[in-house]
Amino acid sequence: MDTQRFQSQFHWHLSFKFSGAIAACLSLSLVGTGLANADDSLPSSNYAPPAGGTFFLLADSSFSSSEEAKVRLEAPGRDYRRYQMEEYGGVDVRLYRIPDPMAFLRQQKNLHRIVVQPQYLGDGLNNTLTWLWDNWYGKSRRVMQRTFSSQSRQNVTQALPELQLGNAIIKPSRYVQNNQFSPLKKYPLVKQFRYPLWQAKPFEPQQGVKLEGASSNFISPQPGNIYIPLGQQEPGLYLVEAMVGGYRATTVVFVSDTVALSKVSGKELLVWTAGKKQGEAKPGSEILWTDGLGVMTRGVTDDSGTLQLQHISPERSYILGKDAEGGVFVSENFFYESEIYNTRLYIFTDRPLYRAGDRVDVKVIGREFHDPLHSSPIVSAPAKLSVLDANGSLLQTVNVTLDARNGGQGSFRLPENAVAGGYELRLAYRNQVYSSSFRVANYIKPHFEIGLALAKKEFKTGEAVSGKLQLLYPDGEPVKNARVQLSLRAQQLSMVGNDLRYAGRFPVSLEGSETVSDASGHVALNLPAADKPSRYLLTVSASDGAAYRVTTTKEILIERGLAHYSLSTAAQYSNSGESVVFRYAALESSKQVPVTYEWLRLEDRTSHSGELPSGGKSFTVNFAKPGNYNLTLRDKDGLILAGLSHAVSGKGSTAHTGTVDIVADKTLYQPGETAKMLITFPEPIDEALLTLERDRVEQQSLLSHPANWLTLQRLNDTQYEARVPVSNSFAPNITFSVLYTRNGQYSFQNAGIKVAVPQLDIRVKTDKTHYQPGELVNVELTSSLKGKPVSAQLTVGVVDEMIYALQPEIAPNIGKFFYPLGRNNVRTSSSLSFISYDQALSSEPVAPGATNRSERRVKMLERPRREEVDTAAWMPSLTTDKQGKAYFTFLMPDSLTRWRITARGMNGDGLVGQGRAYLRSEKNLYMKWSMPTVYRVGDKPAAGLFIFSQQDNEPVALVTKFAGAEMRQTLTLHKGANYISLTQNIQQSGLLSAELQQNGQVQDSISTKLSFVDNSWPVEQQKNVMLGGGDNALMLPEQASNIRLQSSETPQEIFRNNLDALVDEPWGGVINTGSRLIPLSLAWRSLADHQSAAANDIRQMIQDNRLRLMQLAGPGARFTWWGEDGNGDAFLTAWAWYADWQASQAIGVTQQPEYWQHMLDSYAEQADNMPLLHRALVLAWAQEMNLPCKTLLKGLDEAIARRGTKTEDFSEEDTRDINDSLILDTPESPLADAVANVLTMTLLKKAQLKSTVMPQVQQYAWDKAANSNQPLAHTVVLLNSGGDATQTAAILSGLTAEQSTIERALAMNWLAKYMATMPPVVLPAPAGAWAKHKLTGGGEDWRWVGQGVPDILSFGDELSPQNVQVR
């Protein structure tokens, strides 16, 4: 009993006199107890209010007025919680009727879980008074016992036994479990009762329902899982309240003789109200469409029981309905857009698979769609194409301009160190992002193909599988004497839910798993028989003597294959007793001929067979019974050659219970035809709702009153035939739907009407089918529509067919992309499936399970070839003329293979098409080097090459030339690969050439440059000399190599020379990689044309080095020197981030601002232990990157002030070498501290902060930095005080190749803004073997390509004296 808040109402019914009497009795009993000092040992109450327990209460269906309403209660009946509830004795149930159901439902936030606040009473005084009365009575009797002696009491009870008390006063009190909740006053109470929870018969599944193999036996009847009957109720809305102890749950029960069937689409809702028992249309129902927060719209159903409401559909919405009899129903609708009409961009690449370093060509074609069939040109606008690698890292962005007519195209080159895997293209266009993909792998294409030819088209179980493998080179020649290894695995087939499933793969033992191909390239194949329908997976690995093997896997299906004949009829259904003509035709030339036909009726498995006329093409069958039939054609051996399903209508034909069968007479319709639909119900039906659906309910009709968009014919009690005229607006497809309800159940079925969409016919034709490498290929393209020529925009690619053997085409067919079969955008639901529930205790949320990802393996097939060209031609934009013609040419690459030409096109009306053709490149004799091209001095190369011959035992002559000497070898080649050793004695660098002659004609020729390098480690040196007209002595070391001349006459040329020297530095760790990115970014910014060949080269180098930095990153994007394990260094991490930021800014790779904030994470952790110079440099980079660093700058300034550097430290003479690194070697020296002080002054000035360092200390630091010989110190002083191009040139002249790359890169980057744009001075051509070379920075140099080391450098007399840098 709660005496504070929830007081029992019982005490208001007790009179004051009665209360006083209780108090007097209590006082007397206490007095008596004290006087008598009697033994008051009475049992304690042991009373506790029944707590009850958690349970579920739900209404899992609605009810009609003639049905007994009931709710389901689920209590825990198999554990300790049951005993906590059993004490209560059952469940208290109250049933209320809701007076205004629509207003009540509108007030609920969750219609599934009705919330009605309880009126809690607690346990009350009833059991308390019972215990007090029993206790007081017992104590008073004890007092009376002590009043008389024991002998007196015995004498009295012997005389009058009825006065004997016995054990009455020690018996426990009898308590009554009262309902702890008072009735709800707001709603009329219909009935209340206590239902025996644990004695009631538990809910159990229907007879015959059993789950085989269920160890938990969870569908067996469980105590506490019961239905509580509520009796038959009048139509309306009822509230059910169930209580066990202090636990209470509520739910609502819908009673209505009307069912609401709804179809919701993007902006519309169609509601059909029908009788729950007979399914007839019921008009006059009030409908409210709500999203759970408010009513969106409302209406009343018309005479046909339908109502259309217009509003944008939310993801979840509800229909609240009230029929004319007062019945209430609720339907829940879920909607999501499955078809969205907006801009469609078709993004595809020239091929699906690339190597690292390859060029990727991208084409974009687009249309703005307004519905499934109608579109308009896209809006011309700029777009940005982003490339993401397999790790999700953003590699680069490319600007693409999309044109309304021609679309857009772009290209980029993959980094040389690109990771393998799937890459994603993201195109940002008009605030939307579109995606495509391609793959990158380190592959070599197979140099011959392996084909499988089986002895039979179909194999049965128990039959040995025989056939042959055929090995062919790309030009069609057989692979002789190839070593072949076979491996076989088998998977049994089974059918589950009409889907083909495969069991595990198990190896099968083979006899003769290793064999050799014959002269025709054939390998006999004999596999063991399968005892059950199976799939054989045969792995073949073959080698023709080349360095790499070719591996492929072939699939063989046992008792499941493709048909040899097509079997068709005029319609896919007919009437019983009607003669049906079936026609058959061969799909391919075969000796197998059908001799018999057989049909099987699926309903009763009856069958019939008959013979086919010899040489016939058709046969006639008269089906006497309605039903579903399977027809098959068999040959003389009983092998199935063709199959077809056919439906027969007639009296007695029914669908399966709960379903509707719809059979269309054709699979594809042309506009103007009539689609015939056979509708079969499971029982006699008089009323249903027929609709055409796609983006909305396009048309609707009742079965009893057909609308004008269709005609209906009733064939029998359960079958109807609907005829729907097909219009152009149906394309590419539309859904025909049938919906009905009966006896409290509803069913619907959809059937698609597929309509042909006109497509462009694009044909590709070459002037011949076979070409030799280097020949000119002429291609003719033809575009037509319905047989008439039409102008169109085409994109054509010529790709090695072997690429598609490694990676099938990723881009979808252009016709299926722009005009796919649309998904039905209408969702159907009913008020019969709405469930309301309540739970006494909410469950704890469960953490979601972790995702499981697996990586896809990359195929690694090998193919030796001379020229690695995978895309022979790429024409992103070709236009056919009014006659539908276009032409282009390309040179056949130096590769022997089969090429695929793919042409995709679109005309001005948005109609698309795709065509394909094939051609071959072949050559009887061709050569390929089999030796490296770089050697060390002293090596003795074993020179050789491969000659691939398509002839056998034909004499040829091999002529090789090197260093002026010519060698001739007469050879007899066998078919295939022939290795030939060369007889030249090669000991020096030079050009090696080879020529293959036959009958005096040159059949093939190749050449390569061989280089010999010194064994010692090369050290780059440079010097500046003054050169003039005439001879100039160079005085170079004897072992000098890679000699280059560059003009250094102007500051701009000095800057370019240093930039090029940094770019040419060998990459390696984080320092060098970042030091290459800085000058590359400067070179990119200096270019006037970012689309030139030079720009593409610089972009490629930036991509390679950015990716190199990504690969060096450790955990948390922190860096060590070489990417090794360990905690990241804050300075190296900041340098890597800064270099990447410079490169990203240069080439337009955008990142979110918070992305760069990670640069300062490691600095914040390690700043206290870092040298002042390192700290100053990191904050200088951070300030340049616009990162928030004012607080960090204050901390650095305070650290410099606390350092307390002595004045004599600044006055010490700096004797270090100019090539010593201040940053890497002595970052804590006095000079380094001075440079940090000066740099910090500059940073504070930019941030508008005041320094706490004493002015005299700052002046000493400035003087020490200015008087040093370190270029970094001079650069920092120049940044602090300002400068010009002349001062910049003086600093840059002091940069040498021996200095650290980070200091040179920083000087270049910080001094770039002082360089004015001036044209470079042209250095004329020197006399001798000098070759001009274009440099990354925009300048040029002269490189020595002759033998030995030049002693003098000669120019014309007219050359005025110039400063020249020799490296």
Curated annotation (Swiss-Prot):
Keywords: Signal. It holds the Pfam family MG2. The keyword Signal applies. The keyword Coiled coil does not apply. Residues 1-38 form the signal peptide. GO terms for molecular function: endopeptidase inhibitor activity. InterPro entries: A2M_N_BRD, Ig-like_fold, Macroglobln_a2, MG2, Terpenoid_cyclase/PrenylTrfase, YfhM-like. Belongs to the protease inhibitor I39 (alpha-2-macroglobulin) family. Bacterial alpha-2-macroglobulin subfamily. This is Putative alpha-2-macroglobulin homolog. The gene is yfaS.
